[in-house]
């Protein structure tokens, strides 16, 4: 077999936030098995740097959230992108991998592909859900998309855009049968007690819209099940302060166990979870925690979203199952009464409710197996295959 890479390859990877840094580090580790002397360049966070990557700028420079933030930092982001493209065209890496951050990375990939550099986009944007026309630009910009979820690959296949389903790294990190006793010990909780986890979201806007209905639902649930205790993991000090201010107004008397992070352990310890939509819903599914998904947003945002979003479901467990596996209470349906009513079904000790719970957890386990594929290794294999492929 002809060896394409006599020299160790130069592999460019750009991560724009913490989740991308984690994926990048896992990918580098897996690639080093095949290419122990490869050079890794691009934009890296601390985990990728620890694996030996070189970075053009601090990854934090790219980590901006929300439209207002992006607009404010746009000149700087555009400057970094120009600088990155210039450096890549000088360095001529053997392959460029943009991890997530599609609004930043896809334009870079397009420019590099036009200049003969192989490109991969790692983590599919939600083109299957909204702004579906983006798929044509992705097709122009990339040689391959790496997708976490099987329905994403099915969408790309419809448009004949090269895509490989690699499974989800989170499914690799969480045991098929999570250990509740261990989670309780980690959180210093009494495992004989009953808990419900409440995740109000990681963004300020989510806490603003969801803290009140979630807290009111907890109050109603406490009346029905006085023995239930509530675990509230908060992503950072800023969100914790924001949540505590709302709680002081809405439910000052309600006892809660506030946690700094540790959402995964909280969901494993809990009998049920109340959460905002997003990756947290997938994590709850992998933790085998029966959940209720609640979401509210600005009326104008919701008006637009209803017209733009093309999927029947909003939460990843339901999208994966292609059925309403867990309740989704969105906008005007996201009331304390509705949330509490759906959560109460998971807490009932009646035989029929316990059987439904068992069936749901079995479905969660089947879906977990579906996306547990050793994603780091699968991603590395896809990169290697493209690297070793001779130019046509």
Swiss-Prot record:
Presence of the UniProt keyword Isomerase in the record: no
Source species: Pasteurella multocida (strain Pm70)
UniProt key word Lipid metabolism: yes
Protein name (database record): Lipid-A-disaccharide synthase
Family under the similarity heading: Belongs to the LpxB family.
Enzyme class: transferase
GO terms of biological process kind: lipid A biosynthetic process
GO MF entry, a single one: phospholipid binding
Pathway membership: Bacterial outer membrane biogenesis; LPS lipid A biosynthesis
Cellular component terms (Gene Ontology): membrane
HAMAP family: LpxB
Keywords tagged on the record: Glycosyltransferase, Lipid A biosynthesis, Lipid biosynthesis, Lipid metabolism, Transferase
EC numbers: 2.4.1.182
Catalytic activity, as annotated: a lipid X + a UDP-2-N,3-O-bis[(3R)-3-hydroxyacyl]-alpha-D-glucosamine = a lipid A disaccharide + UDP + H(+)
Pfam families documented for this protein: LpxB
PANTHER family: LIPID-A-DISACCHARIDE SYNTHASE, LIPID-A-DISACCHARIDE SYNTHASE, MITOCHONDRIAL-RELATED
Purpose: Condensation of UDP-2,3-diacylglucosamine and 2,3-diacylglucosamine-1-phosphate to form lipid A disaccharide, a precursor of lipid A, a phosphorylated glycolipid that anchors the lipopolysaccharide to the outer membrane of the cell.
